[in-house]
Regions:
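Conserved beta-strand signature within the Rossmann-like core of class I S-adenosyl-L-methionine
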Residues: 130-141
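Short alpha-helix
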Residues: 201-221, 225
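Class I SAM-dependent methyltransferase Rossmann-like catalytic core
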Residues: 1-24
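Conserved Class I S-adenosyl-L-methionine
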Residues: 147-187
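A short, conserved alpha-helix within the catalytic core of class I
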Residues: 114-126
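A conserved beta-strand element that flanks and buttresses the S-adenosyl-L-methionine
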Residues: 106
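Class I SAM-dependent methyltransferase SAM/SAH-binding core
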Residues: 39-85
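Conserved class I S-adenosyl-L-methionine
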Residues: 30-38
Length: 266
């Protein structure tokens, strides 16, 4: 990552939003899996709450961030590069009832980076091994930009974009739609990492697939659900374009899982 410092700084600006689940779940005596942990910033904040009798996994495959997570070893954090390693640990430690602690899977600002197949696999992992699944990510509700505002918003983007070349590249790749307009406003300022950011589908989280598990058939309960407009992003967009973002940009979700039989969860 070209500008990892800038990436981490903007991630930490939304730390309060990422810790929303602390008001709804007691982490004492639980196994915590932080999927896509980056530099371990979320882990550090959770550790400050002094949870008792927990095992904390940071999962991160970026080499630079992996090393940062490893620095938390003295606090009891275990750093691994993938879900498979955690799966093996869970199978070993939960076999024959050796460890009956509940398992919490945290997916904070990471699901949008995954392909649909990988997202499905992560949700399947949560069904097989977890008692709770926590998701916080970007969100766009279909058609939430009103028809009468679409033209005005697009004109402001074209006239006021700080990098017209990058703006043109983005819409060439994404096409022109209300959803792509909303996505551009989320990412236009991340110039230093643009070659990576432009290809990430910010609004690619399959919330419908995740919500499938609230049906009685699979026995999943929604503990908490919230959709909102990120105030930091909304302020930045208004200052740049004079556009008021009166649509949701992010979602927060906590699911209480009923585990299925552990087979091939993919």
């Amino acid at each position: 990552m070209k500008d990892s410092k800038g990436y981490l700084e903007r991630m930490e600006k939304s730390m309060r939003e990422k810790l929303f689940f602390l008001e709804h779940i007691d982490l004492d005596g639980k196994i915590i899996i932080d999927f896509g942990a980056a530099n371990g910033a979320l882990a550090k904040e959770i550790i400050k709450t002094n949870p008792i009798n927990t095992t904390y996994f940071c999962i991160e495959n970026n080499e630079e961030f992996f090393k940062e997570c490893e620095k938390l070893k003295d606090t009891g954090v275990l750093t691994v590069s993938g879900l498979t390693e955690v799966e093996m640990w869970l199978r070993k430690n939960k076999q024959y009832g050796q460890d009956d602690r509940e398992v919490v899977l945290i997916c904070s600002s990471v699901m949008h980076e995954l392909t649909p197949r990988m997202q499905k696999s992560v949700v399947g992992f949560s069904r097989a091994y977890c008692d709770y699944m926590i998701v916080r990510d970007m969100f766009y509700e279909y058609d939430s930009i009103p028809d009468e505002r679409e033209k005005d918003i697009l004109e402001k983007i074209i006239c006021l974009s700080p990098r017209p070349d990058l703006m043109q590249q983005f819409f060439y790749l994404r096409g022109l739609s209300k959803e792509s307009i909303a996505e551009y406003l989320l990412k236009y300022s991340y110039v230093e990492n643009w070659n990576t950011e432009v290809h990430e589908k910010y609004l690619g989280v399959d919330w419908i697939n995740i919500h499938y598990f609230e049906t009685e058939e699979v026995g999943v309960e929604i503990i908490y659900e919230n959709y909102y407009t990120n105030s930091f992003i909304a302020s930045r967009v208004y200052n740049t374009f004079g556009i008021r973002m009166n649509w949701y940009t992010h979602g927060q979700l906590i699911l209480k899982m009923k585990r299925m039989e552990v087979n091939d969860y993919e």
